[in-house]
């Protein structure tokens, strides 16, 4: 039985990108000093637009804490491989596509002077017709918002068009609880409730 597709909320992903482009969400570890934070930030944006993770060990796309995360959450090539996978399983999915197919909320990957791609920004604005000058991105490592693609010096570029996400369909897809966590819906006994916002 095929899983239904969850629509990708591009506006939510882009809003998240603008909110955290020059800051760090305290719910996620900052990998700036341990290889870079770009794909971690891209994954956070994508999660803001889909709300679905894939908790398959090693091959999934998930974040629990700094040490319990899938390689695809923080690794450029792993992110690409997960998003463009052919298997129908939980999590966001998409296709390698030309610049002309891009929309805000899609992703760009650059290859600089190495053999592999090494940077994953999110597209936050795109002109018509799209060009490297009017396609603007947000990123971490180095932090940017509304930065034109044309300001990067790269050897290769590829684009990821997000099509949606497959839902988590079984209880086994749920993550293990982090230490000290509280069951959803149960307030912590010793902590006052904080107002939303």
Mark where each language-model region is:
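...with weaker cross-activation on analogous glycine-rich loops/strands in unrelated enzymes
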Residues: 63-137
């Amino acid at each position: 039985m095929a899983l239904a597709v969850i629509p990708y909320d591009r506006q939510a992903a882009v809003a998240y990108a603008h909110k955290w482009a020059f800051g760090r969400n305290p719910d996620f570890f900052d990998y700036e000093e341990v290889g870079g934070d770009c794909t971690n930030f891209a994954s956070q944006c994508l999660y803001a637009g889909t709300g679905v993770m894939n908790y398959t060990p090693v091959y999934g796309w998930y974040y629990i804490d700094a040490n319990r995360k899938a390689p695809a959450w923080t690794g450029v090539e792993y992110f690409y491989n997960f998003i463009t996978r052919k298997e129908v399983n939980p999590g966001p999915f998409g296709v390698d596509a030309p610049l002309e197919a891009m929309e805000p909320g899609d992703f760009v990957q650059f290859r600089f002077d190495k053999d592999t791609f090494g940077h994953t920004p999110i597209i936050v604005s795109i002109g018509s017709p799209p060009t490297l000058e009017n396609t603007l991105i947000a990123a971490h490592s180095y932090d940017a918002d509304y930065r034109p693609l044309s300001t990067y010096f790269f050897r290769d570029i590829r684009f990821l068009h997000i099509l949606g996400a497959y839902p988590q369909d079984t209880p086994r897809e749920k993550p293990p609880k982090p230490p000290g966590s509280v069951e959803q819906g149960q307030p912590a006994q010793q902590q006052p409730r904080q107002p939303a916002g």
